[in-house]
Amino acid sequence: MRNASCKRVTGETDISMELNLDGTGCAAVATGHAFFDHMLDLLARHSLMDLTLQARGDLEVDAHHTVEDVGIVLGECIKNALGDKKGIVRYGCSYLPMDETLTRVVMDLSNRPYVAFRIPEGGLPDAPNFPLTLCEEFCRALANNLRCNLHVEVLYGRDGHHIAESVFKGIAHALRQAAAIDPRAAGTLPSTKGML
């Protein structure tokens, strides 16, 4: 089983997390921010990882620190659960529709962190109490700590809730593909360099 647990305590947040990459998509998430909890539940459900998360943050200021730090811890936990990455597919790609919204997510579990987060020129609407900039901060924290290459592009959309949901579900499906074990590649790294 590929599982891990991580903890992060700062002056702004206190986060404990356990995850199983080879789960069934069960989530028990409590961040104090209902919309963010909903997004994390979707991420667990669609990636099929089991996720237990308790987070306390300075939500009286805003959700930024909580969202960013949860992304940091989730990235660390997934990286730890992946271990040496032998046998993984490594790459994942998802086009995720959510009603009028379409988002493309491409991931490479390369050990080379990079994030591209793009939205259409002119901007997009925010979800209630969850600005689109928080989606970007989450992606950046996740990718930098998972040490993956992550490209997220919201191709179009009109509803802020649908846009955020398509981003989180898109990440889930790309991660599910990239982290999957390919039995034909058992015991080998998906790299001609011999390392990731």
UniProtKB/Swiss-Prot annotation:
Which CDD domains did the record assign? IGPD (cd07914)
Alphabetical GO biological process terms: L-histidine biosynthetic process
Membrane-traversing stretches: none
Which pathway features in its UniProt record? Answer: Amino-acid biosynthesis; L-histidine biosynthesis; L-histidine from 5-phospho-alpha-D-ribose 1-diphosphate: step 6/9
Paired cysteines (S-S): none
Q: Say where the protein is mainly found.
A: cytoplasm
Keywords assigned by UniProt, alphabetized: Amino-acid biosynthesis, Cytoplasm, Histidine biosynthesis, Lyase
- Return the HAMAP family for the record: HisB
Name-wise, this protein is Imidazoleglycerol-phosphate dehydratase
Query: What organism does this protein naturally occur in?
Result: Akkermansia muciniphila (strain ATCC BAA-835 / DSM 22959 / JCM 33894 / BCRC 81048 / CCUG 64013 / CIP 107961 / Muc)
